[in-house]
């Protein structure tokens, strides 16, 4: 059994991207092990998939029902909350502590890892001052980020999200991963390379520079393999590469809250000529996340909301209590209804009729004040020097479970001992998590 497990989350990677010529390092890893399509969880979004893999359980258990959460008690939506305590199931590092194996765990740039039981944690945590933002990362042990800062430079949050998001984020994270691998020698190391995610959302699944981006990500994998070789652990190391989801090409958004407002379900408060959502008095609203929307409905309005959803072009499915159970998303945090878009659509959070009445944060990179995920933050309008309000700019999305023949995420390893099912079958993300826990 391997003494070191290195798990690399390469967002958006698919089986068709892997070849000896284009991605030789990833290809070589697969040659002594296996390559499998992944059966991901619903919704196929970052926080949900990561929690499912790390805990070996479904959202109905761990409670991370999307990248955002809605607090019904104080009518508040929050996206990208980092606290580990939000995950309601034991993850790999918790199991390590319970079993007392002495294994050391490290996790870099995964979601919901602040204050976790992992021995080593690194995650972006910018500090918002009155006049500026301090680019900082939370680290455990304290001082780890400061050591990295001295060795490889600061982590710039604009590389990680927004109009300037780029492969620089993946490159910095890889360098940090090398540092942790060499200096801490963890038994379990989880790291994250995000830059394909930006490219697919901006450009769709078949953009011109995709080969360059794949070669770049493959070079990063090669650097980690080389580092494991140089520090003498390669013979006792299992590499696992996986992706959280595949992308579909999209051509426009569906502004569910605007439609709900047209049907007098959404209430707003106008303050200084700006319209803000009033969730206290709204009969229903949608917390949107890519191609999935959790819809929270006041009592006695479920049937009318469902009827409205059924009439919206581009809405593929509406999940009620029974279908939520079938997809293992029946958790108290979930919406009363869940809408799923067609493959060529995604849900935007917009609620205004007149863009001039939209809040100032709508035209900024502001991941915490918007009641939904906003991929348009990847774009910039030079004429207004702000984030545009045009959902048609987005060309790729995810979140829905793939239908037959659609693209799926991929699992690659240099070991072949995960084959608990027929090798022709897809490998469940939950099965991967249970497998990892059994390696302890």
Residue ranges and their predicted role:
Residues 6-7, 25, 216-261, 265-266, ...:
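Metal-dependent active-site segment of extracytoplasmic phospho-/sulfohydrolases and closely related
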Residues 8-12, 31-36, 46-51, 68-81, ...:
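Glycine-/proline-rich flexible loop or hinge segments
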Residues 18-61, 104-106:
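Short, structured active-site-proximal loop/turn typified by the sulfatase FGly-forming signature C/S-X-P-X-R
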Residues 46-48, 234, 255, 260, ...:
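Short, solvent-exposed loop/turn segments at the edges of secondary structure
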Residues 57-204, 216, 287, 294-297, ...:
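His/Asp/Glu-rich, glycine-adjacent segments
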Residues 22-25, 121-125, 204-208, 253-260, ...:
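Short secondary-structure boundary/capping segments
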Residues 89, 277-435:
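Active-site neighborhoods of enzymes that stabilize oxyanions during catalysis
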Residues 4-6, 187-190, 238, 336:
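Residue-level preference for the first positions of well-ordered beta-strands
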């Amino acid at each position: 059994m391997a003494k070191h497990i290195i798990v690399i989350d390469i967002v958006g990677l698919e089986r068709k991207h892997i070849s000896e010529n284009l991605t030789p390092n990833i290809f070589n890893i697969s040659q002594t092990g296996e390559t499998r399509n992944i059966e991901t969880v619903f919704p196929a979004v970052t926080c949900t998939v990561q929690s499912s893999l790390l805990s070996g359980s479904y959202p109905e258990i761990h409670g991370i029902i999307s990248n955002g959460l809605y607090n019904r008690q104080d009518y508040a939506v929050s996206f990208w909350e980092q606290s580990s305590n939000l995950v309601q199931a034991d993850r790999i590092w918790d199991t390590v502590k319970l079993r007392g194996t002495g294994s050391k765990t490290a996790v870099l740039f995964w979601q919901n890892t602040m204050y976790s039981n992992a021995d080593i944690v690194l995650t972006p945590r910018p500090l918002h001052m009155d006049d500026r933002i301090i680019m900082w990362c939370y680290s455990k042990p304290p001082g780890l980020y400061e050591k990295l800062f001295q060795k490889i430079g600061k982590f710039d949050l604009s590389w990680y999200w927004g109009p300037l998001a780029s492969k620089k984020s993946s490159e910095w994270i890889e360098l940090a991963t090398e540092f942790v691998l060499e200096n801490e020698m963890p038994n379990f190391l989880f790291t994250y390379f995000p830059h394909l995610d930006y490219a697919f959302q901006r450009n769709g699944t078949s953009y011109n520079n995709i080969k360059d981006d794949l070669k770049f990500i493959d070079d990063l994998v090669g650097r980690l393999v080389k580092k494991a070789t140089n520090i003498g652990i390669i013979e006792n190391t299992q590499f696992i590469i996986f992706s959280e989801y595949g992308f579909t090409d999209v051509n426009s958004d569906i502004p569910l809250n605007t439609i709900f407002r047209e049907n007098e379900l959404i209430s707003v408060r106008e303050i200084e000529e700006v319209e803000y959502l009033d969730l206290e008095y709204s009969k229903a609203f949608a917390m949107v996340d890519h191609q999935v929307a959790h819809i929270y409905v006041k009592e006695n309005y479920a049937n009318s909301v469902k009827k409205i959803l059924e009439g919206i072009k581009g809405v593929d499915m509406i999940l009620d209590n029974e279908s939520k159970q079938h997809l293992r998303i029946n958790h108290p945090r979930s919406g009363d209804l869940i809408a799923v878009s067609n493959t060529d659509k995604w849900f935007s959070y917009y609620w205004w009729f007149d863009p001039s009445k939209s809040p100032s944060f709508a035209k900024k990179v502001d991941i915490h004040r918007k009641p939904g995920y906003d991929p348009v933050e990847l774009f910039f309008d030079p004429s207004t020097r702000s984030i545009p309000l045009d959902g048609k700019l987005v060309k790729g999305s995810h979140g829905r479970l793939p239908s037959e023949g659609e693209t799926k995420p991929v699992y690659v390893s240099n070991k072949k001992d995960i084959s608990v099912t027929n090798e022709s079958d897809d490998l469940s993300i939950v099965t991967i998590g249970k497998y990892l826990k059994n390696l302890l």
